């Protein structure tokens, strides 16, 4: 029986899945909001007391301003979350575009939306600020889950798991640890050996929950995982 190149590629590409629904919501601390570039404000919108966000260090107590047809007044720039509230963020999809939505949730379960911005824009700014270059290079698209994808060298017949060198196995183990923490993931990985210069030849696609990468600790673990396969520029 003749096996064509497409079948060889499909049969030998390794797939590792942590099944379940991609995490849509995650709890964050106020410091995370600041890491994303925002201050949490207690103030007034059109005369009604509420909470909202402004760009980091952009406003101070007593400031008044207009935005999108609404009147804002800053009463206090908060340095901690309001008493008996928690900060949650989730991803919403609208016409194929992902938005990160942040809400304050009180002890009665009432939500107050304080931020809604395009997830890809904020995530990229967050990654750049923290110099997570491997993720920036690998990220391809953002929804409720995001895709990281990279290729180095030309293809061929992928090696079986038993044939993989230590560097490839370390990459898989590290990715699986990240997925265990995020609760969802799908890694497809084809490893073809090494280039004539001794660098790894591979192709991979890795799905993870978008909201998880707004957690700096998880983002750093993803960055380190991608760095295992790093090749010289």
From Swiss-Prot:
Recorded family membership: Belongs to the UPF0128 family.
Disulfide bonds: none
Protein name, as recorded: UPF0128 protein MJ1463
Organism: Methanocaldococcus jannaschii (strain ATCC 43067 / DSM 2661 / JAL-1 / JCM 10045 / NBRC 100440) (Methanococcus jannaschii)
Pfam name, any one: UPF0128
Residues of the signal peptide: none
